[in-house]
């Protein structure tokens, strides 16, 4: 079983990418569980046809410790098992703790015992604070992919996340599998991210082009592969799935200093 964490700055399209990617893996016959580690609890919405899933933390708050796996796990498109860890009430508590509680709960209820090929953790945002680093810190997820675009803040966040990965690489055995570009149609975007990935010591594992089909599918509460399986964008996600499935490059990233990051951005015309 491969345990994969998807990181990236807030709003970059991690949840969309994760759900479309896992749909592609499901088509390849893989057995998958997606664990949403974001208080917004939208990591499995497209797989479940828009169903607002009850989160692990809400269930614990309402029902106490006596929880059945069926209550917190729903089966979505391609038989993908879907769980949302949820978050604390706003202004109270730490969302990162929620992730820890959820993963522990899933382990206790035997969610990992079902012959899974993949578990994906879709993890909130830019901050690699203690709780959000949980899937990598505790050695749950062994491989990480960072979703980025050619925008400065997305790359800044990717560099920061790499610092977190390199910090936990020795203790948790975690490795970076590559950068996934979720294109924003920035000038020289692919070349920029290839140079950025190379500097980090990793690879641009796939470049997902921008497409209106993604938004159309989202409005219909589906992944592109389910909504319009013959569309070119569906094939892009299938190719991303194959790239992840066949990946054999796992590294401890070498995060760069701010001036080096800015030099790469300048070289490709972003800071002109």
Swiss-Prot record:
Classification via Gene3D superfamilies: P-loop containing nucleotide triphosphate hydrolases
One BP term from GO: nitrogen fixation
The entry marks the following residues as binding ATP, namely 8-15
- Pfam families on file: Fer4_NifH
User: From what superkingdom does this record's organism come?
Assistant: Bacteria
What is known about its processing and modification?
A: The reversible ADP-ribosylation of Arg-97 inactivates the nitrogenase reductase and regulates nitrogenase activity.
Q: Where along the chain is [4Fe-4S] cluster bound?
A: 94, 129
This chain's protein is named Nitrogenase iron protein
The organism that produces this protein has a lineage beginning with: Bacteria, Bacillati, Bacillota, Clostridia, Eubacteriales
